[in-house]
From Swiss-Prot:
Ranges annotated as spanning the membrane: 38-58, 67-87, 112-132, 146-166, 209-229, 250-270, 284-304
The organism's place on the tree of life at top rank: Eukaryota
Family: Belongs to the G-protein coupled receptor 1 family.
Protein location: Cell membrane
Extracellular side: 1-37, 88-111, 167-208, 271-283
Glycosylation positions in this chain: 17, 101, 277
The name this protein goes by in its record: Olfactory receptor 5T17
Cystine residue pairs: 109-201
Keyword flag Cell membrane: yes
One example of a Gene Ontology biological process annotation: G protein-coupled receptor signaling pathway
Natural source organism: Mus musculus (Mouse)
Topological category with respect to the lipid bilayer: Multi-pass membrane protein
One MF term in the entry's GO annotations: G protein-coupled receptor activity
Length: 324
């Protein structure tokens, strides 16, 4: 559907005869009212399921003492990240689906980018740390408690957040140091980096290189950690004679590998490509998938085949029903 130019809430500032934009318009998926109502209902349902699933998993780990080990502590942090990740973007999207005023301030756009890149990058590092945790638990189970003590997993979690904050700060500062003096319409549902670079009237060549090499380096390092960790896990599996033992390991590791594959696959598609291959409409759908849909899927992926989580869930529900 062709779009009509949006002039509402187009605030600009005149600086040295150059009009600087102070408010952006998030165009979203479509102008069709009925489709926007459908999208509102769909994304509201996804958001509710995301919060219930992720926060429910956090409560489950806190409540059940059998889940008090590093593997589930990492899972708790991942669930908290996913709840925050979704909450940074979804509420504004929901408002825009039903509103004619789809504006977001310059500062609001920068804040949104800073937060979602922080949570997204932190999740990359955390998934690598979780793979390393699985390697230690399976390859050297007798030394697991020592090698993955609080003195190890707490710094890993802190390092993941630190890396996420640093990466997000670099891109947010680099992006919002550019000049925006033409159209203020962002062809996206949130303030992502590629559509903002496309909107800038400055030379964005260095920004594109920064995005490619920073995102590419993080992807390369974290995926390499995952592959090496699971290489050792595979060696450990080959040494196990028990079919039941192998099934248990595949059940635990399969969930993590599924989550890693989906997350990193979409990240690679989004950010580690030549700029000539970018299609903003296509990227909008893909980025919405990894920022909105994946946080909903993670609790399902990590708990669906996990006997300990399902047993803890049954016990918690039973206890609640008895008290009622």
């Amino acid at each position: 559907m062709p779009r009509t130019p949006s002039y509402t809430n187009t605030k600009t500032t005149q600086v040295n005869n150059v009009t600087e934009i102070t408010v952006f318009i998030l165009l979203g998926f479509t102008d069709d009212v009925d489709m926007n109502i459908f999208l509102f209902i769909l994304f509201l349902a996804i958001y509710v399921v995301t919060l219930i699933g992720n926060l429910g998993l956090v409560v489950l780990v806190i409540e059940d003492s059998r889940l008090h080990n590093p593997m589930y502590y990492f899972l708790t942090v991942l669930s908290s990240l996913d709840a925050c990740f979704s909450s940074v973007l979804t509420p504004k999207m929901l408002v825009n689906f039903l509103s004619k005023n789809k504006s977001i301030s310059f500062a609001g756009c920068a804040t949104q980018m800073l937060l979602f890149v922080t949570f997204g990058t932190t999740e990359c590092f955390l998934l690598a740390a979780m793979a390393y945790d699985r390697y230690l638990a399976i390859y050297s189970p007798l030394l697991y408690a020592v090698r993955m003590s609080p003195r190890v997993y707490v710094p890993l979690i802190i390092a993941s957040y630190t890396g996420g904050i640093l990466h997000a700060t670099i891109h947010t500062v680099a992006t919002f140091s550019l000049s925006f003096c033409g159209s203020n319409e962002i062809r996206h549902v949130f303030c992502d980096i590629p559509p903002l670079l496309a909107l800038s009237c400055s030379d964005t060549h260095l920004n594109q290189l920064l995005l490619f090499y920073c995102a590419g380096s993080i992807e390369l390092i974290t995926i390499l950690i995952v592959l090496v960790s699971y290489g050792f896990v595979l060696l450990a599996i080959l040494k196990i004679n028990s079919a039941e033992g192998r099934r248990k390991i595949f059940s635990t590791c399969g969930a993590h590998l599924t989550g890693v594959s989906i997350f990193h696959g979409t990240i690679l598609f989004m950010y580690v490509r030549p700029s000539s291959n970018y299609t903003l409409e296509q990227d909008m759908v893909v980025s919405t998938f990894y920022t909105i849909v994946i946080p909903m899927l993670n609790p399902i992926i990590y708990s669906l085949r996990n006997k300990d989580v399902k047993e803890a869930m049954r016990k918690l529900l039973k206890r609640k029903l008895v008290h009622e």
